[in-house]
């Protein structure tokens, strides 16, 4: 049977493929080009390294020029002061329970500084507290066994002595803390974490700070607060001013972590100048006293009962300086307790409690005359008292 070709041409071919989309082909081409460029960019350093020569070009050193004036001053200060600072290591003698042998156990490290040509070294009391022996290392590497001359736990100051026969290190120059200003530059040299002769810088952040004493002892007053980095091992080292003079002994930090947090404290040099000569001379610090007895708890009760301020004198020692000046203590009569003299201030500085009174007296020396503002039975007067040696 013949095929009608015209009839077949009237219907489309169901298997005919659609014509390619030129837009899709163009997009695929662009995508491939972008991917190739990205790969080339990624491996470009490797390609450059492969084809470039293996020899590295030498770099020229850029001239630095002169150091800044403050840099020169800091460098000069450290170079002059370094030899006056020492590294202290302590050890404790321990007896073995079974063998009864005695051996030395390392205890801690700290810093100190040369006080005079006689070989006296000043440091913190807590650096050598509980130690059986101490070794002092000089900046030139020499080591010496140190002997304890004296200590004042109330001021956290101790004096050691070493026997340097030749090439004695220079004593650190001494300044004053009476005219310090907040904002002054300060420099701390010490051995933080055993890193010997480390220099840190900062400023005086505040003055006349107080810290509680060890084991409930009297507070340490008139401390210098600084933001110079002070860490464990800096204790006992010098705090210097921009002239390289001693203005304090680095003694404590305030830090939750135990490391420097920008709040450090130093015992002022004026306190050091008052305490150290006594330690060298007598081995202990003798506090100046009035010759009276006071008690903080009883004083607070009396102040609450009378609604007053100051420090009540509980008892006057017969023959004491206070007795000669006419001060009187509390009397117990059949009618009750009769308050005696109440000290309002010392040399014009208020004494709000017993601790403040003792701090005011501690600023002076035995033999100094202080002016007390006292009140008894509602009448005020001023009394001059020559300070005597305390107990």
What is the meaning of each model-derived region?
Residues 2-14:
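N-terminal intrinsically disordered, acidic low-complexity segments at the extreme N-terminus
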Residues 10-12, 20-33, 37-309, 317-318, ...:
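Serine-dependent protease modules
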Residues 121-122, 324-355:
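Conserved PDZ fold ligand-binding element
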Residues 143, 380-382:
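A structural signal for beta-strand boundary/capping segments at domain termini and interdomain linkers
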Residues 367-369:
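Extracellular Ig-like/FN3 beta-sandwich strand-entry sites
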